[in-house]
Amino acid sequence: MADNIINAQRREEKGKGPARRLRQKGLIPAVVYGRKQEPTHLSVDPASLLKAIETPHKFNTLLTLKLDGAEKHVLFKDWAVDPVSRKLEHADFLEVKLDEAVKVAVPVVTSGRSVGQAEGGILSLATHEVVLEALPSKIPVRIEVDVTNLKIGQSIHVSQLTPPEGCKLKYSSDYVIAFVAVPEKEEVAAPVAAAVPGAAPAEGAAAAGAPAAGAAPAAGGEAAKKAPEAKGAKK
């Protein structure tokens, strides 16, 4: 757990100016909220924070925040990054108690190759994460969905999942997690018959071709396509 400790300093100044000066020092503004307490405004080292969540749990890593000589258990709940440099600019922490369940989003992954895929179907995930409740120390790394027996046209719903011990899924039981779709058939264009040299035009082709003898060219015809004379050109 030593690698999951974040040292923080309380900050009194708020706003864009103080935040900018803080980033110039290599720190970022942060806030801790939760447990029906007023938010606490902090500053933390972004490099230390990113290193601390380099675990299989990623953003659901349980962190220990050291502040004013005390320790808080927190989760890294939200963040902001610079749109150009992609550097971390702000962090939000949720304070938790080790004996109280917390609601988090956990990644969903599939395991196995479905029967439907072997038959040419396309496996799709309707969602890439599910929300569940668990104790902070019992949050799973991921939820695995076995799709081995899934046939074309079939789907797996939340009711068919077995959550890890101590976890409760917070989704409707009929919510679709994964399904195997019927492959789309490619439409093949019908071949066009080649024109036979010297053959008479099809009925109506003459009407669509050159104008009748003595008739004026239609608007937009060859006469209309001639480039206009340049301004000042000799006539």
From Swiss-Prot:
It holds the Pfam family Ribosomal_TL5_C. It comes from the Bacteria. Residues 223-235 have a biased composition (Basic and acidic residues). Residues 210-222 have a biased composition (Low complexity). Residues 1-21, 210-235 are annotated as: Disordered. Disulfide bonds: none annotated. InterPro entries: Rbsml_bL25/Gln-tRNA_synth_N, Ribosomal_bL25/Gln-tRNA_synth, Ribosomal_bL25_b-dom, Ribosomal_bL25_C, Ribosomal_bL25_long, Ribosomal_L25_dom, Ribosomal_uL5_bac-type. Keywords: Ribonucleoprotein, Ribosomal protein, RNA-binding, rRNA-binding. One of its GO terms (molecular function) is 5S rRNA binding. The keyword Cell membrane does not apply. The keyword DNA damage does not apply. Transmembrane segments: none annotated. One of its GO terms (biological process) is translation. GO terms for cellular component: cytosolic large ribosomal subunit. This is one of the proteins that binds to the 5S RNA in the ribosome where it forms part of the central protuberance. Belongs to the bacterial ribosomal protein bL25 family. CTC subfamily. Part of the 50S ribosomal subunit; part of the 5S rRNA/L5/L18/L25 subcomplex. Contacts the 5S rRNA. Binds to the 5S rRNA independently of L5 and L18. This is Large ribosomal subunit protein bL25.
